[in-house]
Amino acid sequence: MSDYYGGAHTTVRLIDLATRMPRVLADTPVIVRGAMTGLLARPNSKASIGTVFQDRAARYGDRVFLKFGDQQLTYRDANATANRYAAVLAARGVGPGDVVGIMLRNSPSTVLAMLATVKCGAIAGMLNYHQRGEVLAHSLGLLDAKVLIAESDLVSAVAECGASRGRVAGDVLTVEDVERFATTAPATNPASASAVQAKDTAFYIFTSGTTGFPKASVMTHHRWLRALAVFGGMGLRLKGSDTLYSCLPLYHNNALTVAVSSVINSGATLALGKSFSASRFWDEVIANRATAFVYIGEICRYLLNQPAKPTDRAHQVRVICGNGLRPEIWDEFTTRFGVARVCEFYAASEGNSAFINIFNVPRTAGVSPMPLAFVEYDLDTGDPLRDASGRVRRVPDGEPGLLLSRVNRLQPFDGYTDPVASEKKLVRNAFRDGDCWFNTGDVMSPQGMGHAAFVDRLGDTFRWKGENVATTQVEAALASDQTVEECTVYGVQIPRTGGRAGMAAITLRAGAEFDGQALARTVYGHLPGYALPLFVRVVGSLAHTTTFKSRKVELRNQAYGADIEDPLYVLAGPDEGYVPYYAEYPEEVSLGRRPQG
């Protein structure tokens, strides 16, 4: 395997897969179980999350399904409680196609409320419990829920956001209300669960909303069951004796779909954490005797940034699954913490395809068997470029390109609740009349043997000196500097220049001081000239979404200038390094005088 830019690219060869195949074949029973459950389900079949869970409860009734602190719930008890919850919802008029808003923090009740909702044939609208004000009102408006189940201390946020009770929030129940009403409700499997078809909608999952109001993406039972087969059966390949730890919020698909489906596939245990804490993470993993965990975003980097402890390897984890383990820290992470297998994947809540690292190849998002295309794109619009005949242009073999995913009967695009927003994501008549493709908005780099690596979001990539700059590449270079704890990169405009110049916001490690010459040596040693960040802003902390993605929009809008209160530096050249910002610098860049060398 060959690498460049600190491991950002790996060439996958046949020998790499052949040497890893025996390990995959050893897990054939788990793979087959997932395939039988998920891949054989057809959209019109009577297969659903509720019926699959009922099947597992009948098979594995005495196994522990959920752990949360000192609480434990078996598959049998969880199914009975979910049935009682479903009866409570049905008594309030919830039926097929209705929406139940769920605004709950991580706990067994959240999983049970989801199961109860889908057993009714209804749709679980998984709300981000951090939302307030206009954003919460917007999300509630999209759901138009018949019933809203909320934490008792979050009910006031619903009232204060201005949502109309009857139109937007429906019948508001606290989780304590549901539990109280459920004590006298029937525990038998509801008939409504058997009437649900795989093509029916199971969840609404909200996008992170980094560039505006969140959109509600649609997750059908069919797609969730396919996720069970892919992530649970082919990816994690858990055994019934395994415990999967997840501290990710259950309103996110990595928890609700990847973690929950993988556990249910094998009759394994899901250990829920209240929230992510870098300092407590391994202690909680050890306390739960977890053998696997799910991650997202920068979680792995946060764990690496913690001081080394004797407990770093005092765990039983053998496999982890998620997206966002950066290539530049992959080897350091797996070596320090003794993680034998990384099931990195690429997917999107609204997407219709996925890559998954089945073979444990380092520094890759894995393989996808789906019909895909890597194409040329317009950086300003995010749209694929078309040739003189109006057809989309594929990139040369091995070159990074915008990822398109074919939309067809076997690979449908469920989209958003907003049909206009859904249509904007589709590319029609791309390669021939009548075809249809989903525009992922992501640049991916093919690696061979069906594998690919994530490069950047199109909204983050910028163009400078006629070249496309991937922010992930620049962030990897900056992060290799020993003083940098965390960073995010974005493009900013400079008058009388084309494109956008690179700017970074960084946080420093505890006790470290900014060294402009040393940082310049780092970036010059790792990056081509057009990718060098010209501005560096030293901040106390970086804002993130609740799923650990950097919020760049505000930083990009603030850009640079004398009104920035944080320490701000500019790149003078390879010898002078980064020096304090001065007002003439942007003009010097436009005239080609800076950076020198």
Curated annotation (Swiss-Prot):
GO molecular function: ATP binding; long-chain fatty acid transmembrane transporter activity; long-chain fatty acid-CoA ligase activity; medium-chain fatty acid-CoA ligase activity
InterPro entries (UniProt xref): AMP-bd_C, AMP-bd_C_sf, AMP-binding_CS, AMP-dep_synth/lig_dom, ANL_N_sf, FACL_FadD6
EC id: 6.2.1.2, 6.2.1.3
Any single Gene Ontology cellular-component annotation: plasma membrane
Function: Catalyzes the activation of medium/long-chain fatty acids as acyl-coenzyme A (acyl-CoA). May play a role in the uptake of fatty acids by trapping them metabolically as CoA esters. May also play an important role in the channeling of fatty acids into triacylglycerol (TAG) for use by Mycobacterium during its dormancy.
GO BP of this protein: long-chain fatty acid import into cell; long-chain fatty acid metabolic process
Catalytic activity: a medium-chain fatty acid + ATP + CoA = a medium-chain fatty acyl-CoA + AMP + diphosphate; a long-chain fatty acid + ATP + CoA = a long-chain fatty acyl-CoA + AMP + diphosphate; hexanoate + ATP + CoA = hexanoyl-CoA + AMP + diphosphate; octanoate + ATP + CoA = octanoyl-CoA + AMP + diphosphate
Species in which this protein is naturally found: Mycobacterium tuberculosis (strain ATCC 25618 / H37Rv)
Effects seen without this gene: Deletion mutant displays a diminished ability to synthesize acyl-coenzyme A in cell-free extracts. Deletion of the gene results in a significant decrease in the accumulation of intracellular triacylglycerol (TAG) in Mycobacterium under dormancy-inducing conditions in vitro.
TM region positions: none
Name of the protein in its database record: Medium/long-chain-fatty-acid--CoA ligase FadD6
